[in-house]
Design a protein with these regions (language model features):
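Gly/serine-rich nucleotide phosphate-binding loop at the start of the catalytic core
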Residues: 1-74
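Positively charged, helix-rich recognition surfaces that bind polyanionic ligands
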Residues: 3-5, 136, 147-355
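A generic secondary-structure signal for well-formed alpha-helical elements
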Residues: 29-36, 85, 89-92, 210, ...
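An alpha-helix initiation/capping motif
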Residues: 46, 50, 72-75, 79, ...
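Acidic carboxylate diad motif detector
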Residues: 50-148
Length: 355
């Protein structure tokens, strides 16, 4: 399956209905979270998703406006809450929080259909114009409507048959870095676009303007929208670069080796946190994983504690320490001259192939 995301253009009436759906889903989610917390405090009872879904009928009688939203969409809010609880207990993620208006507004629907190549029908909302042409042969599992920086988007989960790509049998190791985003074992280098740093001054200017506005004022709302649009622009530029790079690698190679980095631990270094976050290594690896599966490429990760930078890829000699500012070095054992990043990428490939 594949997710296809594009912008939609609801009319004024549809915009109101979408905003109502956001609000109703948020209400049901928060009500379910409150019920689960209260039940556990009272007698250690853990209300199931089934228990909370049954309560939706009662809520509809008490709050008539909930009837304006499709039942399946409201039920999905409860399933999202259940997933958040499971993530908390099983994967040690943060405890579920109450949702606020404007905080990643979204909802999921299932009973949609294509009206034409430019319109998609959404239950209780109608036929909404879509930015990109749709292939009618697509089999859609669900659709997620979201809002960001005042713009509306739809993400369709569709059945996807991976294209058959003629592979050459090439193998490659990848070393991720800050100055150079990715260095491949064959010497190919992808520079870090440093997307955030290019817009940092403008972001800071908007943030200063925001701090000087009064809460609840129209000026504050306008500045917040400008800031949100700028953050969206930065995100889109970064995503586009990562998509192109990951697709190129997955398309070209038959075997890819990469280091399993502890990104959460690395961002604790306050000197490098902003640069690491701007790189979005985790997002790149995520993209590479699913694209490798599409294009018939094997992806293998090596342990984060492997000494990939300290080993001579020619003779295996291990250096005691190589400071970060040293970008090129010569092996004292065999005399091979190394580019630090290329050498690390070769070692990552060698270690992965030995497994």
């Amino acid at each position: 399956m594949k997710a296809f995301k594009t912008r939609i253009y609801p009319n004024a009436e549809q915009t109101v209905l979408i905003e109502k759906t956001f609000g109703c889903c948020r209400f049901v989610y928060n009500n379910g979270l409150e019920c689960k917390i209260d039940a556990y405090k009272k007698d250690k009872t853990n209300l199931s998703a089934y228990d909370l879904i049954k309560r939706i009928t009662t809520l509809k009688k008490e709050f008539e406006w909930l009837k304006e939203v499709e039942l399946h969409t409201l039920q999905q809010s409860i399933l999202d809450l259940e997933k958040a609880y499971k993530n908390f207990f099983r994967e040690h993620k943060g405890f579920p929080k109450f949702k606020k208006k404007g905080d990643k507004d979204s909802f999921r629907t299932f009973n949609m259909r294509f009206v034409s190549r430019h319109f998609i029908y959404l239950p209780k909302i109608g036929a909404v114009k879509i930015a990109e042409k749709i292939k009618k042969k697509w089999s859609i599992h669900n659709a997620t409507i979201s809002k960001r920086a005042g713009k509306y988007f739809i993400s369709l989960l569709i059945d996807y048959e991976s294209p058959k790509v003629q592979k050459t049998g090439e193998v490659v190791g990848i070393d991720l870095g800050i100055k150079t985003f990715a260095t491949l074992s064959d010497g190919t280098k992808y520079e870090n676009p440093k997307t955030l740093s290019k817009y940092e001054d403008k972001i800071a200017r908007y943030q200063r303007q925001l701090s000087r506005t009064q809460k609840g004022s129209n000026n504050r709302k306008k500045v917040k929208e400008k800031l949100a649009r700028l953050h969206l622009k930065v995100s889109n530029i970064r995503q586009d670069y990562l998509h192109k790079m990951s697709r190129e690698i997955a398309n070209r190679y038959s075997f890819v080796a990469i280091e399993d980095l502890n990104i959460a631990g690395m961002v604790k270094n306050h000197n490098l946190a902003k640069s690491i976050s701007d790189c979005s290594w985790g997002e790149f690896v995520r993209m590479l994983e699913y694209k490798c599966s599409w294009y018939g490429c094997e992806l293998r990760k090596i342990g984060r504690f492997e000494p990939s930078s300290k080993l001579c890829s020619n003779c295996g000699y291990k250096m005691n320490e190589i400071p970060l500012n040293i970008r090129k070095w010569t092996c004292p054992n065999c005399g091979t001259h190394h580019d630090r990043d290329v050498n690390a990428a070769i070692n990552i490939l060698n270690i992965a192939q030995e497994k």
